[in-house]
A protein has these predicted regions:
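Helix-to-loop junction immediately C-terminal to a conserved catalytic motif
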Residues: 48
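Conserved ABC transporter NBD signature motif
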Residues: 53-72
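Q-loop/switch helix immediately C-terminal to the Walker
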Residues: 82, 87-103
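Conserved ABC ATPase signature
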Residues: 88, 127-134
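Conserved ABC ATPase "signature" region
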Residues: 96, 108-123
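Hydrophobic anchor residue at the start of the ABC signature
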Residues: 141, 180
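Catalytic Walker B motif of ABC-type/P-loop ATPase nucleotide-binding domains
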Residues: 152-156
């Protein structure tokens, strides 16, 4: 279970949100909505243990995220709103390198198959600088097929995706939740999921 208790995020002297509480159980998705600058990315970084909350507590399986550290990171897959890809490397090279850094090495043939599922057949060996924004987003999201983690935290994963890719991602998230995973997602767009979905809106 992922739990936020009385969370607050500050930007300078301004409070983005305060006294925010929620629980996400196994098989559930927390869908976070809000305008630009409302604190969605700040919230996700708190939940991922990357930045501490200005106030409040984040717990994973009953323990504070800041205390778990490496144990928590082994169960987390965080995709920020930036792709994190190296422009000069191919899609395959980026994902192979990322899997090594995550201590879950995978063969290039497995990566190629994941990229095919992401709709990138024929573009796997191109430098990512030659790919469109939507294709770069698909490369980044293909990590979901390669790294087996219980908790997915996805910041604006639908950005630049076409309708087909949005459906693919929704099916991927549903499959993850059916297998006992959890997900936290931010987006300006709606996302049709068959699984149990909790929606919160911040910055209002």
């Amino acid at each position: 279970m992922l739990e936020g208790i009385d969370l607050q995020a500050m930007r300078g002297e301004r409070s983005l949100f305060a006294r925010l509480s929620f629980q996400v159980e196994t098989g559930e998705c927390l869908f976070v909505q809000g305008e630009n600058g409302s604190g969605k990315t700040s919230l996700l970084r708190m939940l991922a243990g990357l930045t501490p909350p200005s106030a409040g507590i984040v717990r994973w399986k009953g323990s504070r995220v800041q205390q778990l550290r490496d144990e928590f990171r082994r169960e987390l897959l965080y995709c920020g709103h930036l792709s994190g890809l190296k422009d000069e490397l191919s899609a395959i090279e980026n994902l192979v390198a990322g899997a090594l850094l995550a201590a879950q090495p995978v063969a290039s043939c497995v990566v190629r198959q994941a990229l095919h599922q992401a709709g990138l057949q024929g573009r796997e060996d191109l430098p990512v600088r030659l790919l469109s924004q939507g294709q770069r987003r698909r490369v980044s999201l293909a990590r979901l097929l390669l790294q087996r983690r219980a908790l997915w935290i996805l910041d604006e994963p639908l950005a630049a995706l076409d309708a087909q890719a949005v459906r693919w991602l929704a099916e991927l998230v549903d499959s993850h939740l059916r297998s006992g995973g959890l997900a936290v997602i931010t987006s300006h767009q709606d996302m049709a999921l068959a699984s149990r979905l909790h929606v919160i809106r911040i910055g209002v």
